[in-house]
Swiss-Prot record:
Hydrolase; part of the gene cluster that mediates the biosynthesis of the tropolone class of fungal maleic anhydrides. The pathway begins with the synthesis of 3-methylorcinaldehyde by the non-reducing polyketide synthase (PKS) tropA. 3-methylorcinaldehyde is the substrate for the FAD-dependent monooxygenase tropB to yield a dearomatized hydroxycyclohexadione. The 2-oxoglutarate-dependent dioxygenase tropC then performs the oxidative ring expansion to provide the first tropolone metabolite stipitaldehyde. Its EC number is 3.1.1.-. It is an enzyme of class 3 (hydrolase). This is Hydrolase tropI. The lineage of its organism: Eukaryota, Fungi, Dikarya, Ascomycota, Pezizomycotina. It comes from Talaromyces stipitatus (strain ATCC 10500 / CBS 375.48 / QM 6759 / NRRL 1006) (Penicillium stipitatum). Keywords: Hydrolase. Pathway: Secondary metabolite biosynthesis. Belongs to the dienelactone hydrolase family. Gene3D superfamilies: alpha/beta hydrolase. It comes from the Eukaryota. InterPro entries: AB_hydrolase_fold, Dienelactn_hydro.
Amino acid sequence: MASLPSQSCCYQGFRHSGAPKGTLSMVKDIEVYTSYPPDKSTEYGVLILTDIVGHRFSNAQIIADQFAENGYFVMMPDLFLGDAVPLNKPGEFDMGKWRSGAYHPQGKNHLPETVDPIVEVCLSEMRSKYQCKKIGAVGYCFGGKYVVRHLIPGKMDVGYTAHPSHIDESELKGIKGPLAIAAAAKDNIFPAEKRHVSEEILQEVGFPYQINLYSGVSHGFGVRGDMNAGEVRYAMRSAFVQAVEWFNEYMKEK
């Protein structure tokens, strides 16, 4: 694998201050959070694929709004069909059972067979209803796998992922567009050896790539980091700017 499966660090962290400005609506049977740029343009879209805390987590919604403030129409779907994991969930929790659908009321799993169609519905909606000319995708942790899986012409034009999880090497080898990665120096899911493997693969596939390594931070810093810790706050803000600049470079016409 280019990164390892999700662990408990994937739902632990801190809630940030601020009030989301976007709206919740339905695309078919999928709830989505959308946020518009100041000029209301949908020419350039960003699809955010969240970590397992999900699209209703206020931190994720605030990040979506920040991408919108930087000139992008943003859609962020419920990848888990109502079965996201609460932040800092107490008690025992079996990640394997969760992935297999054991905790979902209808037994819906959280594997590609279920998640891929959600991503495809949203991409189609962005292309058809919203007439997005170019689509960039952001994947945090769990969502990073699906950025990599769909980074092909006609789906996603540009990709970005922070502290990705559960990506197979074959998936990374299959990308057909520019990909940027924000990595944490302290990350059991995307450790140094996996970063190095990923770098070798990205060199081989030949598309533009970027891997930024942030010291002093752990898995999840891009969404759930402690904003009271200066090093973490800097890394989170820098990783966000990394994504915006990546999209500006590879999505927008010069």
